[in-house]
Amino acid sequence: MRIAVLSDIHANLPALEAVAADLPPVDEAWVLGDTVGYGPQPNEVIAALQAMGARSVMGNHDGAAIGTVDPVDFNPDARAAIQWTAGALDANARSYIAALPLVRADGEVTAVHGSPRDPIWEYITGPAIAAANLDAYETRLCLFGHTHLPVAFRALDGEIDATIGLPGTEARLGSERAMLNPGSVGQPRDGLRDAAYAVLELNGSSADDTFEFRRVVYDIDRTQRLMREAGLPARLTERLGYGR
């Protein structure tokens, strides 16, 4: 089985469209939350994911946009974008977000946005935090987003191995537990501005399973123009150009 793994699209339709066009043949698409927030096209992104039949979980920006997550910890630009998003969402988008689970598990894979443990919006940024989360889910693999940084954390011989998700890098998974982050489709923060996603390949034998990190160029100028037209914060618009 091949699963497209997307996260942190953040209402960036041109980035999502570029990823969809770049995808190899896959059996399923999983989205790890923060479908909206920051970007200018929340309704269009949600409609596109519905058309793809994507299996999604809720992120903190998704919940904040419909009032189920308190944005008290958001920075001023993020709060301003959420206020704009809340006013822009149509009825279909609100219903879609409200129905999203915080955790999704199927077979050997668990999907969350931030963390499988409390606090669920924890940022898993390094091996020590990943190690502390390994017992918080029941499956072999855990897919997560939230940090906007592509990485694979794998348990190997009692240690945590971290593979940075450079474009084209393929992490071989094996039988041990692993936590896998595809990076961000709509607002990368690893210094590369291209949309990031991954393909998880489950081959029936854990020794042959892989997680491939992929990047694709998208029309950043189009997204930035729409953000300016919407009056979204300038810093959010500008950061797309340098991937931070």
What residues fall within each predicted segment?
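Beta-strand-turn-beta hairpins that frame and shape the catalytic cleft
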Residues: 1-4, 105-111, 173-179, 209
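N-terminal active-site segment of His-dependent metallophosphoesterases
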Residues: 1-54
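Anionic-ligand binding region
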Residues: 127-170, 175-180
